[in-house]
């Protein structure tokens, strides 16, 4: 019967209690009735006291909306039609055709219409079309909105009492979307809603004892925009989905698990800004007739495959869930709860293998979408999708027993013990702990090292460890994407070693860990891993050996420095002794001459005239003065000759056996050069005929003069030569004799000889065929006489390439430019400035020198190949062949 006042309500209460036989029960709680009798009749006041719980299966399809001091308008049955299915439109994505269900079931047996609130559970059920074929009928929901009005005089059908939802006005749900009085654009509001949604979700996750199912926006098809009556675009709809119950998180599966027999429940919060009147489609603006909510499932591996959602009925049967029709008021939050829902299918590969999760496990995802309806078309406004879900036919709790049994609470507080092997990102750990991925350790990793636990302790050979480390190859590489993904490796580019190569050098540092399967199914049999601790200890031994070698080298360097100081001191002593011995020899020689002077009589038989030594001979002091003067002149000549003649072959371009470069030349005087003193046999000439035409002879009269030039290093050497004195040869011989009693110095120094010499432009090799016959070609000094073909033009470039087997330094100590060969003096003067050699030193393995050979009739060059920091152009020639090697090149134009 309809309740219209206190008497009718009281009568209805007593009739119900009397029929059930509970009126005399002392435990009967009549507080609700007393409060109702004490207040004015208000449907909203009565419903406000009901708890906020989802509807149960025996109740009506939808709870009446909570009203506070307002009335509810009556809806005619024609206005309450609910679509039975949502179908995709062929010409517009996201548009679903709707078919109105019959409204004959909306009338009760008493002839009165159903409750005039929006019906959230249509009775009609139809299959869905391709977009959401999982749509089901018979929906259970709690539907709330603010504010709603109730028309006076409306009668309510007698139904079972059920919980109602609370009014969202002044409730905790109102802070989800904060509406500003100022206009808001869709984009700014969407960002704000997402931020508030994430904060709300985080707060809920913090309050809940177990993880909650997470949701995110789902845009499988474009969302449509809403417009008001002024054709102004409204901000995006505020949309949030919360999972109430039905899903349990499984740590073993790393996913939420839902039992197909148990129902789940979700709550949707919807906020509309402004008053939406139109929806923007590809066909233009369409008026909005109604809003619909529709949940469905999709497969993770194929999101185009739809999983239908079912709902439990009062008789425990299940029916396909149909979209529910909702009414969204302007600038209000609408809360809709969908309960008693089930997935129509279970996920594939749910069976476990040996009590462990199946590696081929399949997953579902739940989608809840909001649509705007226009005639028979539905347009998607917003949708959210959940994370992956496993749907099993049995209780998921039974799968956790075998996992939990391995973990026990330890004896130490706040400790957990696992008796077995632990694998992270792997289902087959072969060690106590196997981690597939990166691992961060903020502390230290300790290893057992107590001597009481060790035996057979032996010292290792550090020299052998150094040899093994020197053989190991360090490489950069990239892991294959399929392997890195399977192993959880984020950084594919690494630096390290190859296990196969390490096994050949250090077998105990490589281990086989079995077969490894990549993400693409490829199996790596007997996968190898490297024990870097073993390699680290090898490095420690190698460093110790290097320290020993360094100490030995330092000791030898100190000894060499001591020997160097001793040699320098002996050299100075030898020079001073030689000067003293020379002075003493001169005095002795003068005394010997004076002692051997004749004091006898010279007679002639024919004339019989005799000269008496006492009477007719000159005084002794005259003879002594004459002898001393002669000896002084001889000594002066010897010194002058020593100054003019160099003490070593490195100071002259040629020796006395072969004439030097001419000092002067004139047109009337013929050219006298080394070319006239060459041996009779012929050596290969430097010719450019293979690359240039050889038609003209360049052996013209010589206009220029010989010019001897020296580099700055040579000038420094010449400044030091006067201080060496003429006794450098004696000092050198003394040092050579001293060195013969010691070890061979050459074994300690770098080889300073040249491996190859060639003219780069014509690839002409300069070898021992060009060695001088009259001068030595070895023992630290090499002399080369190189003839140049007479057809060689005067403007070609000569590049001398010197190659060494060690990283050495090549000094150009001296060069001598001989006679120029041009047709006129003007041409000769034009080339004067281009003949200067400016390069002083090169270093490395390859040394290239550009020499002005072509413009000159003859020229000479002195190069010194030295070890770094051991010699230069000023080094004593005695060390030739030890610290450096001298090379002399004499180029001349062969005009015979």
UniProtKB/Swiss-Prot annotation:
Stored InterPro entries: MRF-like, MYRF_C2, MYRF_ICA, NDT80_DNA-bd_dom, NDT80_DNA-bd_dom_sf, p53-like_TF_DNA-bd_sf, S74_ICA
Q: Quote the biased-composition stretches of kind Low complexity, using this chain's numbering.
A: 659-672
KW ATP-binding (keyword) present: no
Q: Where is the composition biased (Polar residues)?
A: 648-658
> Annotated DNA-binding ranges?
111-403
Where are the membrane-spanning stretches?
622-638
Q: Which biological process annotations from GO are given for this protein?
A: positive regulation of DNA-templated transcription; protein autoprocessing
Region described as Disordered: spans on this chain: 648-672
Q: Where in the cell is it found?
A: Membrane
What topology does the record note for this protein and the membrane? Single-pass membrane protein
Q: Provide one Gene Ontology cellular component.
A: endoplasmic reticulum membrane
GO terms of molecular function: DNA-binding transcription factor activity; sequence-specific DNA binding
Domain Peptidase S74 residues, every copy = 449-557
What keyword terms does UniProt attach to this protein? Coiled coil, DNA-binding, Membrane, Transmembrane, Transmembrane helix
**Coiled coil stretches, renumbered:** 541-573
The record's similarity note reads: Belongs to the MRF family.
Under which name does UniProt file this protein? Answer: Myelin regulatory factor-like protein
């Amino acid at each position: 019967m309809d309740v219209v006042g206190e008497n009718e309500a009281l009568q209805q209460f007593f009739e119900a209690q009397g029929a059930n036989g509970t009126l005399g029960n002392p435990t009967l709680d009549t507080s609700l009735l007393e409060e109702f009798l004490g207040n004015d009749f208000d449907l909203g006041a009565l419903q406000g006291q009901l708890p906020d719980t989802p509807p149960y299966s025996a109740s009506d399809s939808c709870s009446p909306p909570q009203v506070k001091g307002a009335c509810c308008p009556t809806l005619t049955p024609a206005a309450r039609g609910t679509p039975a299915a949502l179908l995709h439109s062929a010409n517009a994505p996201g548009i679903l055709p709707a078919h109105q269900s019959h409204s004959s079931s909306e009338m009760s047996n008493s002839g009165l219409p159903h409750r005039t609130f929006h019906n959230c559970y249509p009775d009609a059920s139809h299959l869905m079309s391709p977009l959401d074929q999982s749509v089901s009928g018979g929906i259970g929901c709690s539907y709330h909105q603010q504010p709603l009005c109730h028309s006076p005089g409306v009668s309510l059908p007698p139904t079972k009492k059920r919980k109602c939802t609370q009014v969202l006005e002044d409730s905790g749900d109102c802070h989800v979307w904060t509406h500003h009085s100022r206009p808001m654009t869709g984009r700014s509001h969407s960002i704000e809603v997402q931020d508030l949604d994430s904060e709300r979700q985080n707060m809920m996750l913090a309050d809940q004892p177990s993880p909650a199912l997470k949701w995110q926006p789902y845009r499988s098809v474009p969302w449509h925009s809403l417009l008001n009556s002024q054709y102004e675009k409204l901000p995006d709809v505020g949309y949030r989905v919360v999972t109430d119950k039905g899903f349990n998180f499984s740590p073993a599966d790393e996913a939420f698990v839902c039992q197909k027999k148990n129902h789940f429940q979700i709550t949707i919060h919807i906020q509309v800004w402004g008053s939406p009147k139109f929806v923007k489609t590809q066909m233009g603006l369409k008026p909005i007739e109604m809003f619909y909510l529709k949940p469905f499932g999709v497969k993770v591996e194929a999101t185009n495959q739809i999983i239908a959602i079912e709902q439990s009925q009062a008789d425990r049967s299940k029916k396909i869930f149909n979209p529910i029709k909702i009414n969204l008021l302007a600038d209000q939050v609408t809360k809709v709860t969908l309960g008693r829902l089930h997935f129509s299918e279970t996920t594939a590969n749910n069976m476990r293998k040996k009590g462990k999760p199946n590696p081929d496990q399949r997953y579902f995802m739940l989608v809840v979408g909001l649509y705007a309806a226009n005639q028979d078309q539905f347009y998607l406004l917003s949708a959210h999708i959940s994370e992956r879900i496993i749907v099993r036919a049995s209780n998921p709790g039974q799968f956790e027993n075998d996992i939990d049994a391995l973990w026990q609470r330890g004896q130490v507080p706040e400790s957990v013990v696992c008796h077995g092997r632990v694998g992270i990102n792997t289902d087959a750990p072969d060690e106590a702990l196997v981690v597939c991925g990166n691992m961060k350790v903020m502390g230290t990793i300790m290893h057992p090292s107590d001597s009481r636990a060790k035996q057979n302790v032996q010292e290792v050979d550090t020299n052998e460890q150094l040899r093994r480390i020197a053989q190991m190859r360090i490489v950069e590489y990239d892991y294959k994407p399929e392997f890195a993904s399977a192993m959880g490796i984020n950084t594919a580019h690494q630096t390290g070693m190859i296990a196969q190569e390490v096994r050949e050098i250090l077998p105990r540092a490589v281990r086989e860990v079995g077969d490894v399967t990549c993400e693409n199914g490829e199996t790596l049999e007997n996968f190898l891993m490297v024990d870097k601790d073993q390699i680290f200890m090898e490095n420690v031994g190698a460093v110790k050996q290097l320290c020993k070698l360094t100490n030995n080298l330092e000791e030898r360097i100190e000894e060499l420095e001591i020997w160097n100081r001793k040699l320098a001191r002996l050299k100075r002593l030898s020079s001073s002794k030689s000067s003293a011995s020379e002075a003493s020899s001169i005095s002795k020689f003068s005394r010997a001459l004076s002692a051997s002077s004749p004091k006898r009589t010279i007679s002639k038989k024919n004339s019989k005239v005799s000269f008496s030594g006492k009477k007719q001979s000159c005084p002794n002091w005259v003879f002594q003065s004459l002898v001393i003067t002669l000896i002084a002149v001889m000594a002066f000549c010897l010194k002058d000759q020593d100054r003019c003649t160099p003490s070593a072959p490195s100071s002259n371009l040629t020796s006395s056996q072969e004439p030097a470069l001419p000092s002067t030349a004139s047109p009337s005087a013929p050219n006298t050069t080394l070319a006239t003193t060459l041996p009779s046999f012929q050596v290969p000439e430097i010719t450019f005929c293979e690359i240039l035409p050889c038609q003209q002879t360049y052996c013209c009269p010589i206009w220029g003069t010989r010019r001897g030039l020296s580099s700055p290093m040579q000038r420094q050497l010449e400044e030091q030569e006067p201080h060496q004195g003429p006794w450098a040869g004696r000092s050198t011989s003394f040092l050579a004799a001293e060195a013969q009693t010691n070890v061979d110095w050459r074994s300690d120094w770098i080889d300073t000889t040249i491996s190859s010499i060639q003219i780069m432009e014509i690839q002409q090799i300069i070898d021992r065929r060009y060695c001088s016959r009259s001068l030595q070609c070895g023992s630290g000094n090499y002399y080369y006489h190189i003839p140049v073909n007479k057809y060689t033009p005067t403007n070609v470039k000569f590049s001398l390439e010197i190659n060494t087997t060690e990283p050495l330094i090549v000094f150009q100590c001296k060069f001598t430019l001989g006679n120029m060969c041009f047709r006129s003096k003007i041409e000769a003067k034009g080339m004067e400035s281009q003949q200067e050699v400016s390069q002083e030193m090169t270093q490395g393995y390859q040394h290239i020198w550009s020499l002005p050979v072509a413009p000159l009739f003859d020229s000479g060059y002195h190069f010194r190949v030295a070890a770094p920091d051991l010699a230069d152009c000023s080094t004593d020639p005695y060390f030739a062949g030890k610290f450096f090697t001298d090379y002399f090149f004499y180029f001349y134009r062969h005009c015979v």
